[in-house]
């Protein structure tokens, strides 16, 4: 039986109570003893019902008493009274007399109360007021104790809750620690899996190479086995014949005195000797085979690693072709063999030779009237892209066809196209045909090939040039026709700019240039002013299909009544150090000087930064423009100015070939982002006699066409850049020679405006300015006038291309036409050819403009004019206030690469758009990141440049930072709004995939970038920021604008992995993850000079 619970109130205010369990044996006395305090006096239990109070006797059974109340038991309240029961008082009073009761009431009642209240001696008599005061004090003490008790209960409750929380937190910490350990274990497993994956790929490559080698050796062994079997059969036959001879049965001959005679003995001796030779040869071949096998096993590890790297670069280069065409807007289909491979701005550039890709060309045929001793004196140099350009005979109707490789998969159309020409000019001597000591310093095989420019529709065969068609003065220029053609223009964000290559004129050969290349980070697409009318042959067969020859000199063919073709018909390539003119060339001599020009000898000259080495640094080659033979017949022939400050007769006979052994060849570093130091060349310090002899040979050599927007080349038609001369004067590494400064005359109304660059707004046509010394003393460099002219229009009425323009040339009838890609003027109809001017005494002082030469049709030997910087009598001053001014974007690109922080801070306010790329999509931020200049990167990012600018292959600055394993730069770019999921075009790899595994910092950089990829859309409560605007294409997609904060609800699902489900405001839908970033993009700063 369950006991009842009796609630007993210990005071009248019903705040203090206790609960007593009641059993059938429980009496009222038990309840009182349970409830009263220890040591307390007499107490009794009273029940109150509806305001009536009745004491309960001590011997009363409480269980039965409660059952008597029944359902009304809840109305009854039991109180513990701290006094004797009234029933006992009444019984005691009945036995006493009335007096005794009166006396008791007077005396004893206070005593009882005193005893009840704990007052000690009952003999002490207290008045009623004292008793009331005492009761009030005790009541106050009771209330204080009750409050203390409540506070202690609350404290106990709080401690219990805290204890429960601590236990709960301890358990959660244990769970979290277990989860962390599990995550670390999984990360370690993931790292092991990635490492194993790399090992598996490496093993696959090794196994493939080994299996191929084993198959090759097995085939060789089978051949040797067959040869041995054939030899054994032959031995058996010979042995049988010998036995027959011994027995005397062969041809009826009998042995005479034991000796064999007659033709049989001679045949037997010959066969025996042949057998001995064959056995010896077989043994030698077996020993060589064994040695080769041992060498192969010895080098397998090295070859495997090299093959892996080569395959990666090959895939990267193969993937660049599509982007190259896209950047240049070329829509004609090209085979994989026909496009120039280009390495991105980051990562080493390695070319691997492979046979059978291009036809093998024979050694160049010596021109009919040229004497090139050095070509025959040395073998072909084995550069990575070794190939020979054939030399065609002058004025011949047939050409030598190059030898084709067996099994070559395409024919060489170059010679076939050349046969159709009426008059074919002599081809330039190929660089690779020169010996190793004679190579003109251009590392042909180690230069990243440039992007082909936007040109006309390519013919079916790569690089073929159809025969030129006549073009009258009123015909439409090539660029104007090209603008109306079907080829797409390059995008505005990545304008493809063209540069003129150096072209030899009719009957001339190029002057090889400097071997001291300053490594340029950006390969520049070429665009020659004078294209070849006959197609050149292609490089020989140990170059890769994706990597054509990186230095191609195209001939200029003068055909009567014909017009040179557009220079963009074929793969025009130049040296990677496109800032500098790396070789010289001769101009087309006037009509009446053709024999002398044809007999002039090609001389390999060591040049520095595109300038020829001249005697005492006093003069430079004359800037004669190329003259088209048939188009210049009606104009007076100019007199080629003398190269010397003395009168020199023109050499009619062929000059002796120069000794090319002094020309050095500097290797190019693998990384396209680093600049190679300049090595001093002994040729620079040649004696005056050697230089004088060289100067005589170069008397009629024209000034080579320059690349545009270069620190060392002119930016317009005004000749060499003044900065180049200052740079070379103050920097001994830059050549230490003095060149001839050229000044422009005041522009005529034919020239359209004064532009600092001939790009018509397309800045930095060259990519980078190399080795810019920002602190050198220079003269003010204001803008120079530049004509806006058609780049490839070769008709006569147009300004002179990138050459010195004298006052006499400004009144010509020019027909300028604009081209946004390549503004290089073409051949002018000039009555006079401007003459060069000797170099000024110092770079900063005012120069005297050049004095023009009078028109002349007599040989240059009769010329008495000297080039001087002195003002001649009766000469007018030209070039009033004209100075050279650099392209600000070109300076910004170069300064960000070189780490010139002060120059970056100054020049960035002059740049219209600091995020504007060059022709390969390289921005200043790319250069600063690749060079590791953290302070410049931070400045550019704070300035608000486009952090997600992509180059022609889709490489963003984040890709560059990842390829350098720079965690600091990666973090800086990500926090500035870099797109973590941006991928390249060729290999579709994000920045996390570009970390260099073999270099330092790979683990930290890879972990950071992969971590950001995994945390995007998870951390920051799932908020990611839009980096571009996007308009929804389907109903389930979400439109957003740049800077919107999107909440990623689901990173991937069954149907989509590249699209995430996100919420923007009250709308939800799919968003492409590669347009999202962990941080918003920094807005461009207000353009101010403050």
Swiss-Prot record:
Modified sites of kind Asymmetric dimethylarginine: 554
GO biological process annotation, one example: intrinsic apoptotic signaling pathway by p53 class mediator
Pfam families: Ank_2, ASPP2-like_RA, SH3_1
MF-aspect GO terms: p53 binding
Bias (Polar residues) ranges: 382-401, 420-429, 506-522, 572-591
Coiled-coil region list: none
Sequence ranges of Low complexity compositional bias: 91-104, 453-478, 612-627
Main location: cytoplasm
Extent of Pro residues compositional bias: 525-538, 774-785, 849-858
Known tissue expression: Reduced expression in breast carcinomas expressing a wild-type TP53 protein.
Cellular component GO terms, alphabetical: cytoplasm; cytosol; nucleoplasm; nucleus; plasma membrane
Entries under InterPro entries matching the protein: Ankyrin_rpt (IPR002110), Ankyrin_rpt-contain_sf (IPR036770), ASPP1/2 (IPR047163), ASPP1_RA (IPR028319), ASPP2-like_RA (IPR048942), SH3-like_dom_sf (IPR036028), SH3_domain (IPR001452), Ubiquitin-like_domsf (IPR029071)
Miscellaneous note of the record: In contrast to its official gene name, it is not a regulatory subunit of protein phosphatase 1. This name was given due to its similarity with a protein that binds to protein phosphatase 1.
Function: Regulator that plays a central role in regulation of apoptosis via its interaction with p53/TP53. Regulates TP53 by enhancing the DNA binding and transactivation function of TP53 on the promoters of proapoptotic genes in vivo.
Assembly behavior: Interacts with P53/TP53; the interaction promotes pro-apoptotic activity.
Name of this chain's protein: Apoptosis-stimulating of p53 protein 1
Organism the protein comes from: Homo sapiens (Human)
Classification lineage: Eukaryota, Metazoa, Chordata, Craniata, Vertebrata
């Amino acid at each position: 039986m369950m006991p009842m619970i009796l609630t007993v109130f210990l005071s009248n205010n019903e705040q203090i109570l206790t609960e007593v369990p009641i059993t059938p044996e429980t009496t009222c006395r038990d309840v009182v003893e349970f409830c009263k305090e220890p040591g307390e006096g007499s107490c009794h239990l009273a029940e109150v019902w509806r305001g009536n109070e009745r004491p309960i006797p001590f011997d009363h059974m409480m269980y039965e008493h409660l059952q008597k109340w029944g359902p009304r038991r809840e109305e009854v309240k039991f109180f513990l009274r701290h006094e004797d029961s009234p029933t006992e008082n009444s019984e005691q009073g009945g036995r006493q007399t009335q007096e005794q009761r009166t006396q008791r009431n007077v005396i004893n009642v206070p005593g009882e109360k005193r005893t009840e209240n704990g007052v000690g001696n009952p003999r002490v008599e207290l008045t009623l007021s004292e008793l009331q005061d005492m009761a009030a004090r005790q009541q106050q003490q009771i209330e204080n104790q009750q409050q203390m008790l409540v506070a202690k209960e609350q404290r106990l409750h709080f401690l219990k809750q805290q204890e429960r929380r601590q236990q709960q937190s301890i358990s959660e910490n244990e769970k979290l620690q277990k989860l962390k350990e599990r995550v670390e274990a999984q990360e370690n497993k993931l790292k092991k899996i990635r490492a194993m994956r790399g090992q598996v790929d490496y093993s696959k490559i090794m196994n493939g190479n080994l299996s191929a080698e084993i198959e090759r050796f097995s085939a060789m062994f089978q051949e040797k086995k067959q040869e041995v079997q054939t030899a054994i059969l032959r031995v058996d036959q010979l042995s049988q014949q010998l036995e027959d001879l011994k027995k005397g049965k062969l041809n009826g001959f009998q042995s005479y005195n034991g000796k064999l005679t007659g033709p049989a003995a001679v045949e037997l001796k010959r066969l025996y000797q042949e057998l001995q030779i064959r056995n010896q040869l077989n043994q030698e071949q077996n020993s060589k085979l064994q040695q080769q096998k041992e060498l192969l096993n010895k080098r397998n590890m090295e070859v495997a690693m090299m093959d892996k790297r080569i395959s990666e670069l090959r895939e990267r280069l193969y993937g660049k072709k599509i982007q190259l065409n896209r950047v240049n807007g070329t829509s004609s289909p090209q085979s994989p063999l026909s496009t120039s491979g280009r390495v991105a701005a980051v990562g080493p550039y390695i070319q691997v030779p492979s046979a059978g890709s291009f036809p093998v060309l024979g050694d160049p045929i010596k021109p009919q009237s040229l004497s090139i001793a050095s070509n025959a004196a040395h073998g072909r140099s084995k550069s990575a892209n070794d190939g020979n350009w054939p030399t065609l005979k002058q004025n011949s109707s047939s050409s030598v066809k190059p030898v084709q490789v067996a099994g070559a998969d395409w024919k060489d159309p170059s010679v076939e196209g050349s046969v159709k020409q009426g008059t074919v000019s002599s081809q330039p001597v190929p660089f690779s045909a020169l010996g190793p000591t004679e190579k003109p310093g251009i590392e042909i095989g180690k230069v990243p090939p440039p992007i082909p420019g936007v040109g006309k529709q390519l013919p079916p065969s790569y690089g073929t040039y159809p025969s030129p068609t006549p073009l009258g003065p009123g015909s439409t220029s090539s660029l104007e026709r090209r603008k109306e053609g079907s080829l797409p223009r390059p995008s505005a964000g990545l304008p493809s700019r063209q540069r003129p290559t150096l072209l030899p004129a009719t009957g001339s050969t190029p002057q090889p240039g400097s071997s001291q290349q300053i490594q340029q980070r950006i390969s520049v697409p070429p665009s020659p002013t004078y294209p070849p009318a006959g197609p050149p042959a292609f490089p020989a067969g140990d170059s890769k299909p994706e990597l054509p020859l990186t230095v191609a000199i195209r001939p200029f063919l003068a055909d009567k009544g014909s017009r040179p073709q557009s220079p963009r018909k074929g793969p025009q390539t130049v040296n990677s150090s496109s800032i500098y003119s790396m070789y010289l060339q001769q101009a087309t001599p006037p009509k009446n000087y053709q024999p002398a020009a044809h007999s002039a000898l090609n001389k390999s000259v060591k040049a520095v930064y595109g300038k020829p080495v001249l005697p005492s640094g006093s003069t430079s080659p004359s800037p004669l423009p190329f003259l088209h033979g048939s188009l210049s017949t009606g104009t007076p022939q100019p007199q080629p100015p003398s190269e010397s400050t003395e009168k020199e007769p023109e050499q009619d006979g062929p000059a002796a070939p120069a000794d090319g052994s002094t020309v050095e060849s500097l290797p190019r570093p693998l990384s396209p982002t680093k600049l190679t130091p300049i090595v001093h060349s002994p040729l620079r310090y040649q004696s005056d006699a050697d230089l004088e002899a060289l100067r005589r040979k170069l008397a009629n050599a024209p000034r080579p066409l320059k690349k545009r927007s270069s620190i060392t080349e002119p930016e317009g038609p005004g000749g060499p850049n003044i900065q180049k001369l200052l740079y070379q004067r103050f920097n001994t590494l830059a050549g230490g020679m003095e060149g001839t400064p050229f000044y422009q005359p005041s522009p005529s109304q034919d020239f359209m405006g004064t532009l600092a660059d001939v790009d018509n707004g397309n800045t930095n046509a060259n990519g980078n300015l190399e080795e810019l010394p920002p602190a050198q003393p220079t003269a003010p460099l204001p803008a120079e006038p530049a004509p806006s002219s058609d780049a490839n229009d070769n008709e006569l009425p147009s300004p002179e291309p990138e050459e010195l323009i004298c006052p006499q040339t400004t009144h010509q009838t020019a027909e300028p036409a604009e081209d946004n890609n390549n503004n290089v003027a073409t051949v002018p109809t000039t009555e006079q050819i401007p003459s060069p001017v000797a170099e000024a005494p110092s770079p900063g002082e005012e120069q005297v403009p050049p004095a023009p030469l009078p028109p002349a049709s007599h040989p240059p030997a009769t010329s008495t004019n000297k080039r001087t910087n002195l003002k001649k009598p009766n000469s007018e001053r030209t070039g009033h206030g004209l100075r050279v001014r650099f392209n600000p974007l070109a300076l910004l690109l170069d300064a960000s690469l070189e780490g010139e922080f002060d120059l970056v801070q100054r020049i960035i306010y002059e740049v219209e758009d600091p995020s504007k790329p060059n022709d390969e999509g390289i921005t200043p931020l790319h250069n600063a990141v690749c060079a590791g200049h953290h302070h410049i990167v931070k400045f550019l990012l704070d300035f608000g440049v486009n952090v997600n600018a992509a180059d022609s292959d889709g490489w963003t600055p984040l890709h560059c930072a990842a390829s350098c394993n720079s965690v600091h730069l990666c973090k800086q770019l990500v926090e500035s709004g870099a797109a973590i999921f941006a991928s390249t075009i060729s290999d579709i790899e994000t920045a996390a995939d570009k970390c260099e595994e073999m270099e330092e910092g790979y683990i930290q950089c890879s972990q950071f970038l992969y971590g950001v990829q995994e945390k995007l859309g998870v951390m920051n409560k799932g908020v990611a920021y839009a980096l571009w605007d996007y308009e929804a294409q389907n109903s389930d997609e979400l439109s957003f604008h740049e800077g919107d904060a999107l909440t990623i609800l689901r990173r991937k699902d069954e149907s989509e992995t590249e699209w995430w489900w996100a919420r923007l405001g009250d709308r939800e839908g799919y968003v492409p993850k590669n347009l999202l970033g962990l941080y918003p993009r920094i807005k461009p700063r207000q353009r101010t000079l403050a």
